[in-house]
């Protein structure tokens, strides 16, 4: 599968970027929904997401990820298995993601799931 820089479309010499930092949401470290590929310029330069001027790009990616989660989690409550399958994560990662969330009839509320995936906060008006 050929990968391209999310920003400029260049291929080759790409770096994986976690939209929500691994330190914020360790459970999503291997979740492909939380990863985009960036060229070194858009990843590490001053204009890159980790650079001095990267805040807007970072916010844009977070909003897009949040919107994607809102589309995927399209009902009010989900089981742990449904969450795991939707995110494509392991049992252990799912338990880690959900351990602080309240259960209702052994199910988790949509807004709590999305907030947890986003590192504990929601961004903008989605």
Which residue stretches match the model-derived regions?
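Short cysteine-rich loop/turn motifs with clustered Cys
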Residues: 1-15, 39-41
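Cys/His-rich zinc-coordinating "finger/knuckle" motifs
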Residues: 12-16, 46-49
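Short recognition patches in nucleic-acid-associated and regulatory proteins
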Residues: 13-27
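Polybasic, low-complexity binding patches
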Residues: 23-34, 44-87
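Helix N-cap / beta->alpha transition motif
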Residues: 39, 79, 109-110
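Helix-turn-helix DNA-binding helix
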Residues: 94-95
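Short Lys/Arg-enriched helix C-cap and helix-to-coil transition segments
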Residues: 99, 103-126
């Amino acid at each position: 599968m050929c990968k391209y820089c999310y920003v400029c479309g260049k291929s080759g010499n790409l770096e994986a970027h976690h939209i929500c930092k691994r330190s914020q949401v360790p459970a999503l470290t291997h979740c492909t929904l939380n990863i985009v590929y960036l060229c070194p310029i858009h990843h590490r330069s001053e204009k890159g997401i980790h650079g001095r001027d990267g805040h807007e790009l970072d916010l844009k990616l977070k909003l897009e990820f949040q919107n994607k989660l809102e589309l995927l989690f399209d009902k009010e409550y989900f089981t742990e298995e449904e969450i795991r399958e939707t995110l494509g994560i392991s049992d252990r990662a799912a338990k880690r993601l959900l351990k602080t969330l309240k259960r209702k009839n052994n199910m988790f509320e949509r807004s709590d799931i999305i907030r947890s995936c986003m590192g504990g906060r929601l961004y903008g008006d989605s």
